[in-house]
């Protein structure tokens, strides 16, 4: 029996339909020599600081920085039942191989590996790596399963990202909140993004409009405009020179241009 673990129920159902696992069970599908189950996104995550030391429940400057020597994980309370299903399946004696069918990416790798490790599973692991949910793509993916070890680096990268988020979020949030006597959430991604917004707002506030002038000629079928000029007198001079004259089109050039959407701020 081979166990397939997808990242979400909808994906698991699509995989099961192709594999012939049509019998619905509690938290998984079975059939054709396959067990197909699913996570619900991240079933587990890095534990909060208070898990390491109850004293960390209170935010104090003297406790910083908080640097776990051995990282711990906790199961999300609202997802405990599905984790128990997966753990039971992973420990079944008739399951000889596990297929990681979570999303093809860094986070998908972390979602599966976390469950796999917390369940204490050491069974052979394969990786399904597909970018399409078409039946043909699924069949091809299962025909070309890769060794799970090929993606150890991806798992380590995802775990590094998660730990970096934890270290910055826990320590910086507590530091600034204690110093300024108010809750100030700091994040590895959130704070730089907020800084970009603040910087843009400052640019808008400092903007000073500068007048400019140009001369436009209304011609049959199109309008021809001059370059911008800083001085009105220069524009008036060009306007006077054009009045009563004859326009000759010497060259026509057509180009497709992509106009980017205006920035939200």
Feature names for model-found ranges:
Residues 1-162, 166:
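Intrinsically disordered, low-complexity regulatory segments
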Residues 18-22, 46, 89, 118-122, ...:
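Conserved, well-folded catalytic cores of nucleic-acid-processing
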Residues 43-77, 88, 184-265:
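Long, highly charged, low-complexity internal segments
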Residues 92-94, 170, 209:
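Short flexible coil/turn linkers enriched for glycine and charged/polar residues
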Residues 157, 182-184:
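Alpha-helical hydrophobic/aromatic positions enriched in membrane-embedded helices and signal peptides
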């Amino acid at each position: 029996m081979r166990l397939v673990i997808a990242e979400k129920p909808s994906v698991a159902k699509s995989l099961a339909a192709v594999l012939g696992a049509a019998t619905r069970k509690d938290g998984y599908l079975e059939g054709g020599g396959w067990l197909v189950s699913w996570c619900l996104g991240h079933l587990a995550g890095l534990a909060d600081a208070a898990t390491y030391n109850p004293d960390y429940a209170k935010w104090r400057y003297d406790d910083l920085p908080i640097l776990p020597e051995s990282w711990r994980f906790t199961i999300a309370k609202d997802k405990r039942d599905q984790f128990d299903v997966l753990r039971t399946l992973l420990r079944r004696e008739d399951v000889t191989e596990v297929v990681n069918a979570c999303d093809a990416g860094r986070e998908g790798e972390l979602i599966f590996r976390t469950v796999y490790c917390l369940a204490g599973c050491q069974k052979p692991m394969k990786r399904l790596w597909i970018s399409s949910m078409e039946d043909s793509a699924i069949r091809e993916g299962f025909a070309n399963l890769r060794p799970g070890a090929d993606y150890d680096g991806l798992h380590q990268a995802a775990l590094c990202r998660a730990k970096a988020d934890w270290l910055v979020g826990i320590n910086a949030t507590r530091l600034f909140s204690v110093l300024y006597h108010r809750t100030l959430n700091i994040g590895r991604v959130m704070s730089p993004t907020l800084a970009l917004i603040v910087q843009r707002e400052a640019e808008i506030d400092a903007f000073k409009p500068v007048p400019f002038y140009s001369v436009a000629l209304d011609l049959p079928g199109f309008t021809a405009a001059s370059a911008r000029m800083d001085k009105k007198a220069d524009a008036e001079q060009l306007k006077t020179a054009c009045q009563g004259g004859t326009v000759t089109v010497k060259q026509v050039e057509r180009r497709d241009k992509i106009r980017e959407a205006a920035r939200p701020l």
